[in-house]
Amino acid sequence: MPNPSPRYISNLTRDTYALILAGGRGSRLHELTDWRAKPALYFGGKFRIIDFPLSNCINSGIKRIGVVTQYKSHSLIRHLVRGWGHFRKELGESVEILPASQRSSGNWYEGTADAVFQNIDIIRDEIPKYVMILSGDHIYSMDYANILAHHVESGAKMTVSCMPVPIEEAAGAFGVMSVDEDYRILGFEEKPENPTPLPNDPTRCLASMGNYVFDTEFLFEHLKHDAQNEGSERDFGKDIIPSIIKDHPVFAYPFSNDDGEVSYWRDVGTLDSFWLANMELVSPKPPLNLYDKKWPIWTYQEQLPPAKFVWEEYNRCGAAIDSVVSGGCIISGATVRKSLCFSNVHVHSYSEIEESVLLPDVEIKRNCKIKKAIIDRGCIVPEGTVIGHNHDEDRARGFRVTNKGVVLVTREMLGLKVGI
């Protein structure tokens, strides 16, 4: 397909309403999501996961957005109000928060399709030609205008963004599809234990990214039909897509960069994947460029002083090497290597931090040694604590240790007051 004109793209994005599904817990993240929804989880030194699909919308020119919330949504809603509440409805801009409120029945959101169905009246009031359904819990940068143009030019009623994923990663985790030579979807399974491999690559399969484009009236018709089906689980992957691919044009859209290569996309749904995706950012040329001025990631920014590194004495030098250190941090006579320090982190003298993710407001007292760990927001790690060097001792103290050796520490595990 030739490159569409800017005016054509502008018309498409103006005619589109984006609905971001941000109500999930992310149970595979264990205690890290005990007090927050997965889309509210911190990422990349200063952002939250929800900032990525929201920024993609704004950068793509889509400025009518709804965010569906449900599980422990207070911190997510607070972030949205503070960071995304500046849009002006009279200019055709809005980020609306849509909490589960039993709008069309006596039930809360029962699945991804039901979350959209219960907000049909709100979507209809916007009079869009197209509706984008977006997952609120993945990390990636994507120009949604391209998938919109592909959707219209292909004559699809529904388009599913996809990318090749290793079989072992997709098993039980992603929707998997099979397509013909034109990328029309022939089969779709939601989170199969034995995914169907690609014809030309038995090690990978074609996985859904959880992002969909619909013709609006087609979406409404099939949501209403699904709502009347007592056997439905009210889910796009389990019910809607399998029910429409036989009789309607439903196409896959491969997510790739300008060179045709597979683009960056991370599902940070486990502690290991969350840790690894953050660790990728400390490399000299990370796969995700957070410094791209042409595609900025927007977020709420608290007014904080600059990061500070103090003390230069023998065995007591405040330094950070191959690390990301955010505003308000103080590295006082400590060494931080290959780590991310979110805002307001304070690491005291003689402590050593390596390959770790320190979420906001963490304080590491003196003489601590921490390696390959995730320290949750607000943790105060006592003086002399050693984490990540002996996993048997870590488990004995109540810390969670993953199969790949990442140690999670939360306030409850340290006996501190709990909150979001």
Swiss-Prot record:
Query: What EC number is given for this enzyme?
Result: 2.7.7.27
Q: Does the keyword rRNA-binding apply?
A: no
Pathway(s) the chain acts in: Glycan biosynthesis; glycogen biosynthesis
Q: A GO biological process this protein is involved in?
A: glycogen biosynthetic process
Keyword line: ATP-binding, Carbohydrate metabolism, Glycogen biosynthesis, Glycogen metabolism, Nucleotide-binding, Nucleotidyltransferase, Transferase
Supply the Gene3D superfamilies for this chain.
Hexapeptide repeat proteins (2.160.10.10), Spore Coat Polysaccharide Biosynthesis Protein SpsA, Chain A (3.90.550.10)
Where, by residue number, does alpha-D-glucose 1-phosphate bind? 109, 175, 190-191, 208
NCBIfam families reported in the protein's UniProt record = glgC, PRK00725.1, PRK00844.1
Q: Give the UniProt family note.
A: Belongs to the bacterial/plant glucose-1-phosphate adenylyltransferase family.
Record text on subunit structure and interactions: Homotetramer.
What protein is this chain from?
Glucose-1-phosphate adenylyltransferase 2
The opening ranks of the lineage are: Bacteria, Pseudomonadati, Pseudomonadota, Gammaproteobacteria, Alteromonadales
